[in-house]
Amino acid sequence: MTITTSEATSHTLGGPIRVMVVDDSAVVRGLETRMLEEDPAIQVVASVGNGQMAVQALDRHDIEVVILDIEMPVMDGLTALPELLRKSPNLKVIMASTLTLRNAEVTLKALQMGASECLAKPTTSREISGGTDFRHDLVEKVKALGGARRRALGRAAPTARAGGAVVERKVGALPSLMAQRAQQPISLRPAAEERPDIIAIGSSTGGPQALFTVFGDMRKGGWPSQPIVVTQHMPATFTTILAGHIERVAGVPTAEAKDGDPIRGGHIYIAPGDYHMVVETRGTEKILRLNQDPPESFCRPAVDPLFRSVAKAYGRRVLAVVLTGMGADGSKGGKIIAESGGTVIAQDEPSSVVWGMPGATAQIGACSAVLPLKDIAAYVLRSANKR
């Protein structure tokens, strides 16, 4: 079976992605601005010190992506967020916060309120300026979200500045994997006939909201007996809080995985930040192992190691779900699951915050279905309840 993704259109507004940096530290604003503007596809058009100033800046600038600090005087990030989205509903907001339990809680709440992504911010300006991981995450998240926003609005793709001038390229000509995918057909493969023994989920940008939706819908439909393993791209501390939020939404035991945990049916296991989570067979039981092998697709935890491991441990009896996220993590592992006889499904482009991971998985020919987010839980439950 073949389906075709919607072709991205152009134009009305091209040039670099227009960004606003919001942080009460002038030093941090300066460092983030410099990092962003080193990439010619990004332009920082506003830099302000609190949430109130950020809301006011929307009246003066056409802003596409906001880097929003949490703790600020006058108006903090969580208070500013709904005001920003009210003024500019298509705005993409990245919550930037240090790795504390309180900030992780606030960030998860912000994601539920409409923020698109979170970014772990080093605690000192020295760590920010010297951190290549932070620089990479900052730039790539801005580009992914800015590009996704323009595609959704039918605008021109992000383009580079050359000698101070804007060099415009239409989406169809953009030599990026995402733009190429938008014009290629997707071939679907038959789903496995067997009922899966495990459900594996991978997600990144927009993933927490998508996970809450899927698990909330599954709870309404009757929880399956299979265990569920989840890799969501998130730093340590944040995944701890995520597990707690998911448990409240799903109504089943949910926890960050610990090395050596036996896998139990009806439980959800979340890969902890900074650790890959994989499944191993030990005698007659399956267990979870954690490792700090090198990052894959710039991520640890990454989805591909999990998917490879469930294919090895369970063979055909795997259902894998790839939700919204930037990059292509999960696509290679998804192909291995499919070639082992398991079933892989992906979230569709219109319902994804960023159609990177699910798009790559679909385009590589691994999927048996590409579905709107609202239909994923029903598919999972049908598969889980096969006789």
UniProtKB/Swiss-Prot annotation:
GO terms for biological process: chemotaxis. It catalyses: [protein]-L-glutamate 5-O-methyl ester + H2O = L-glutamyl-[protein] + methanol + H(+); L-glutaminyl-[protein] + H2O = L-glutamyl-[protein] + NH4(+). Keywords: Chemotaxis, Cytoplasm, Hydrolase, Phosphoprotein. The modification 4-aspartylphosphate is found at residue 69. It is found in: Cytoplasm. Pfam families: CheB_methylest (PF01339), Response_reg (PF00072). CDD domains: CheB_Rec, REC_CheB-like. Residues 190-387 form the CheB-type methylesterase domain. Residues 18-136 form the Response regulatory domain. One of its GO terms (cellular component) is cytoplasm. The active site is at residues 204, 233, 329. It is an enzyme of class 3 (hydrolase). Coiled coil: none annotated. Phosphorylated by CheA. Phosphorylation of the N-terminal regulatory domain activates the methylesterase activity. Gene3D superfamilies: 3.40.50.2300, Methylesterase CheB, C-terminal domain (3.40.50.180). Its EC number is 3.1.1.61, 3.5.1.44. GO terms for molecular function: phosphorelay response regulator activity; protein-glutamate methylesterase activity; protein-glutamine glutaminase activity. Its main location: cytoplasm. Belongs to the CheB family. Involved in chemotaxis. Part of a chemotaxis signal transduction system that modulates chemotaxis in response to various stimuli. Catalyzes the demethylation of specific methylglutamate residues introduced into the chemoreceptors (methyl-accepting chemotaxis proteins or MCP) by CheR. Also mediates the irreversible deamidation of specific glutamine residues to glutamic acid. HAMAP family: CheB_chemtxs (MF_00099). Contains a C-terminal catalytic domain, and an N-terminal region which modulates catalytic activity. PANTHER family: PROTEIN-GLUTAMATE METHYLESTERASE/PROTEIN-GLUTAMINE GLUTAMINASE, PROTEIN-GLUTAMATE METHYLESTERASE_PROTEIN-GLUTAMINE GLUTAMINASE 1. This is Protein-glutamate methylesterase/protein-glutamine glutaminase 1. The lineage of its organism: Bacteria, Pseudomonadati, Pseudomonadota, Alphaproteobacteria, Rhodospirillales. The gene is cheB1.
